[in-house]
Amino acid sequence: MDYPTLLLALLHVYRALCEEVLWHTSVPFAENMSLECVYPSMGILTQVEWFKIGTQQDSIAIFSPTHGMVIRKPYAERVYFLNSTMASNNMTLFFRNASEDDVGYYSCSLYTYPQGTWQKVIQVVQSDSFEAAVPSNSHIVSEPGKNVTLTCQPQMTWPVQAVRWEKIQPRQIDLLTYCNLVHGRNFTSKFPRQIVSNCSHGRWSVIVIPDVTVSDSGLYRCYLQASAGENETFVMRLTVAEGKTDNQYTLFVAGGTVLLLLFVISITTIIVIFLNRRRRRERRDLFTESWDTQKAPNNYRSPISTSQPTNQSMDDTREDIYVNYPTFSRRPKTRV
């Protein structure tokens, strides 16, 4: 191999390693995981192929309605599809007994007629839960059916180079929109929900979620990247609840806080009263024991004086005596 050819090969590898891979969905690594690929349109499917993206694209599996399914040898025992006939538009790839070597980027490429090529890139990362590591900066509450506008304004002074909006869920992050303001490129999202966004130079970045439903609730992240290397992140939590406006939600939270405070005060009062009663009872018992101890040596009674008159007692013991005697006749005796 001559020097120019070697240099071009090294340059190609360097660009492949350094170039940022734009993904549509990010999922955490697991031994048994699924990479979702659902084609939104109803065109005629001609071929589907899964790749793992690295320095080059390694083919994992390929399906054709005419020739059937072929899974490449390194993945034959580790991946499968639920719908073996591929009659539907769901081309989700399932892993069994995956290893850390399976962390990386995957591409699901569909070829349809007459729409053409449709591609989705999925990133597999080492993470337990996405929501747990992302605190929110603000909270927005809305009723179903309304249009919700999410806005982030950078504090950086450098010109913004790229803006990325994401929806964060516990087991998945979906890219909503990506704007490269330097090259004027808008990365097409594969998110099944319609999102309206502006991709223009300015101090604000805005997305609009029309006709929101309860399923739109969650965390939304705005990621701003400056040309000087500075980055800023804003996270907003959206709650879509039936019949609850911002004021009603605030009243609900305030009422719950007041009830919780009253409950804590009641419990504290009961505990204080119980401790005071217990303390008084212990003091009373201690005083009684001390009094009995002091009184025990003088526990005697004065003798009753016999010289004192007992008239009252004698009077009380006097009783009337009744005698039964025969009745004698009062007639005079007859003299002889």
Swiss-Prot record:
<dbReference type="GO" id="GO:0019901">
    <property type="term" value="F:protein kinase binding"/>
</dbReference>
<dbReference type="Pfam" id="PF07686">
    <property type="entry name" value="V-set"/>
</dbReference>
<feature type="glycosylation site" description="N-linked (GlcNAc...) asparagine">
    <location>
        <position position="147"/>
    </location>
</feature>
<keyword id="KW-1015">Disulfide bond</keyword>
<dbReference type="GO" id="GO:0002891">
    <property type="term" value="P:positive regulation of immunoglobulin mediated immune response"/>
</dbReference>
<dbReference type="GO" id="GO:0033005">
    <property type="term" value="P:positive regulation of mast cell activation"/>
</dbReference>
<dbReference type="GO" id="GO:0042802">
    <property type="term" value="F:identical protein binding"/>
</dbReference>
<feature type="disulfide bond">
    <location>
        <begin position="152"/>
        <end position="222"/>
    </location>
</feature>
<feature type="modified residue" description="Phosphotyrosine">
    <location>
        <position position="322"/>
    </location>
</feature>
<feature type="glycosylation site" description="N-linked (GlcNAc...) asparagine">
    <location>
        <position position="231"/>
    </location>
</feature>
<dbReference type="GO" id="GO:0045954">
    <property type="term" value="P:positive regulation of natural killer cell mediated cytotoxicity"/>
</dbReference>
<feature type="disulfide bond">
    <location>
        <begin position="179"/>
        <end position="199"/>
    </location>
</feature>
<feature type="glycosylation site" description="N-linked (GlcNAc...) asparagine">
    <location>
        <position position="198"/>
    </location>
</feature>
<comment type="subunit">
    <text>Interacts with PVR and NECTIN2. Competes with PVRIG for NECTIN2-binding. Interacts with ITGAL; this interaction mediates CD226 localization to lipid rafts.</text>
</comment>
<feature type="domain" description="Ig-like C2-type 2">
    <location>
        <begin position="135"/>
        <end position="239"/>
    </location>
</feature>
<feature type="glycosylation site" description="N-linked (GlcNAc...) asparagine">
    <location>
        <position position="32"/>
    </location>
</feature>
<dbReference type="GO" id="GO:0045121">
    <property type="term" value="C:membrane raft"/>
</dbReference>
<dbReference type="InterPro" id="IPR003599">
    <property type="entry name" value="Ig_sub"/>
</dbReference>
<dbReference type="GO" id="GO:0008037">
    <property type="term" value="P:cell recognition"/>
</dbReference>
<comment type="function">
    <text>Cell surface receptor that plays an important role in the immune system, particularly in intercellular adhesion, lymphocyte signaling, cytotoxicity and lymphokine secretion mediated by cytotoxic T-cells and NK cells. Functions as a costimulatory receptor upon recognition of target cells, such as virus-infected or tumor cells. Upon binding to its ligands PVR/CD155 or NECTIN2/CD112 on target cells, promotes the cytotoxic activity of NK cells and CTLs, enhancing their ability to kill these cells.</text>
</comment>
<keyword id="KW-0325">Glycoprotein</keyword>
<feature type="transmembrane region" description="Helical">
    <location>
        <begin position="255"/>
        <end position="275"/>
    </location>
</feature>
<feature type="region of interest" description="Disordered">
    <location>
        <begin position="297"/>
        <end position="316"/>
    </location>
</feature>
<feature type="glycosylation site" description="N-linked (GlcNAc...) asparagine">
    <location>
        <position position="186"/>
    </location>
</feature>
<keyword id="KW-0677">Repeat</keyword>
<dbReference type="GO" id="GO:0060369">
    <property type="term" value="P:positive regulation of Fc receptor mediated stimulatory signaling pathway"/>
</dbReference>
<feature type="disulfide bond">
    <location>
        <begin position="37"/>
        <end position="108"/>
    </location>
</feature>
<feature type="domain" description="Ig-like C2-type 1">
    <location>
        <begin position="19"/>
        <end position="126"/>
    </location>
</feature>
<keyword id="KW-0130">Cell adhesion</keyword>
<dbReference type="GO" id="GO:0032729">
    <property type="term" value="P:positive regulation of type II interferon production"/>
</dbReference>
<feature type="modified residue" description="Phosphoserine; by PKC">
    <location>
        <position position="329"/>
    </location>
</feature>
<dbReference type="GO" id="GO:0038023">
    <property type="term" value="F:signaling receptor activity"/>
</dbReference>
<dbReference type="InterPro" id="IPR013106">
    <property type="entry name" value="Ig_V-set"/>
</dbReference>
<feature type="glycosylation site" description="N-linked (GlcNAc...) asparagine">
    <location>
        <position position="83"/>
    </location>
</feature>
<dbReference type="InterPro" id="IPR007110">
    <property type="entry name" value="Ig-like_dom"/>
</dbReference>
<dbReference type="GO" id="GO:0002860">
    <property type="term" value="P:positive regulation of natural killer cell mediated cytotoxicity directed against tumor cell target"/>
</dbReference>
<feature type="topological domain" description="Cytoplasmic">
    <location>
        <begin position="276"/>
        <end position="336"/>
    </location>
</feature>
<dbReference type="GO" id="GO:0007155">
    <property type="term" value="P:cell adhesion"/>
</dbReference>
<keyword id="KW-1003">Cell membrane</keyword>
<dbReference type="GO" id="GO:0007165">
    <property type="term" value="P:signal transduction"/>
</dbReference>
<feature type="topological domain" description="Extracellular">
    <location>
        <begin position="19"/>
        <end position="254"/>
    </location>
</feature>
<feature type="glycosylation site" description="N-linked (GlcNAc...) asparagine">
    <location>
        <position position="90"/>
    </location>
</feature>
